[in-house]
C-alpha cells in the first residue's frame, strides 16, 4: 500500500517547504499542488545550485516524479510558461511530466490589473498581496463566472465568456480605480497562443491521483503559503484567498481526507511574516536584524524583506489543531546559532493580564503582549549536522521544549538549505 503524505506550512509561509518536499519526493511517484498560485515561492538548493519554483510542484527536480497541478490552484498561463522555459533551459524535462487539471481557474491580465489597483487604492491600509491576481481570480471562481484551463480549448465559448468578464472588470478598472481598460483582442490572442502549449499537459488530475492511489503509489501533496494565511483560519483580512490548511487538500485535489496518511507541518525555528498583519513576537532590534540577515529573509516571489521574530508556540498550537498535524519539521535551526539566549512565546497577555490562546482574526490581536519563556542559546554551529546526537545540548533542549509546548513530535530537523543538510527522526513515508 502506498502512502499519501502532506507537506504544509504552519506559520505565515516561507517555512522552507520546498526543500522538504524535494527531499521527501525521493519516495514519491507524484507530487501535487492543490491551492494557491504563482504567489508561492519554493526555494530548492541541490548541490549548491538554487532553484525557485512558483507554480510547478517542487518534485520536478526529481527524475521520474510526476507533477500535478490540481483544480484548487489558480493558473497564470504566462507565468507557468516562463517557469517551464526556465527549467527546460537548465535541462529539466517538464512537459512530459507536468499535468494540469482542466478545472483549475485561470489568472488573466485583468485579475492582475484589479489586484494592483486595489492595493494602490488602499494606501497605508493595504493587505500586502503579491499583486499577481490571485485574489481576483478566486473571486471569479466563487462567483461562478471565472474561466478555467479547460475553457482554453473551446475558442468561441472562451471568447464569449472573456467578453462578458472584460465588460464587468473593465467597468471597475476605468470608472472606480481610474486605470486603463484591458484590451479584449490582445487578451484573447494571448490566451489562444497559450492554449496550444498547454493542451498536451491537460489531464483529469483527480482521476489520475486515484489511479495512482489504487496502484499503491506514494503521493506527496505540496501546500503553498502557511496556515495563518488561510482565508478562513488565518489572521483575517491579512490572509491569502485560498485554504492553506489541510481542508484545502481535499477540495483542491479531489482526494478525500480518509486517504491522507500523514500531515507534516513545516515550522521555522523562529517566526517570519511578509507584508501587513499582526505579528505578536516581531523583533525591531538587533536580534531581529540578525535573524533576517542570517536567514536570508527576503521573499523568493516578491523580494520583499520578511519581518522576523521569536518562535511562537501559540500560533503553532492552533495550526496543529486545525491541520491535524502528524509531525513537525523544524527548519532553519542553524540561524539561531550564536545567540546567547532564545525566547519562546508561550502565551499572550491582554489588558486584563490574562494569558489567552491565538485569536481567530487580526483585530483581536490588538493590545496583546507575548509571554516569553527564556532558554539558553548555543555557541556551536549546527549547520549541516546530520544526527540529533551531534546537536549542541542547548539546541536539543530547545527542540524538546517546543515539542512539549505544542504537543506534537518534531520528526525532521533542517540544519541548512541543501536537501542533504537534514536530520530525519521519523520518515513520513515509512
From Swiss-Prot:
Molecular-function annotations in GO: adenylosuccinate synthase activity; GTP binding; magnesium ion binding
Residue sites binding GTP per the record: 13-19, 41-43, 306, 332-334, 414-416
EC numbers, comma separated: 6.3.4.4
GO biological process terms held by the UniProt record: 'de novo' AMP biosynthetic process; IMP metabolic process
Keyword Ribosomal protein applies: no
Cofactor: how bound: Binds 1 Mg(2+) ion per subunit.
Active site: residue positions: 14 (proton acceptor), 42 (proton donor)
GO cellular component terms attached to this protein's record: cytoplasm
Chain sites annotated for binding substrate: 300-306
The organism's place on the tree of life at top rank: Bacteria
Pfam families, per database record: Adenylsucc_synt
Binding site for Mg(2+): 14, 41
CDD domains in the cross-refs: AdSS
PROSITE patterns referenced in this protein's UniProt entry, alphabetically: ADENYLOSUCCIN_SYN_1, ADENYLOSUCCIN_SYN_2
Principal location class: cytoplasm
Subunit structure: Homodimer.
Cited function: Plays an important role in the de novo pathway of purine nucleotide biosynthesis. Catalyzes the first committed step in the biosynthesis of AMP from IMP.
Name of this protein: Adenylosuccinate synthetase
Organism: Pseudomonas entomophila (strain L48)
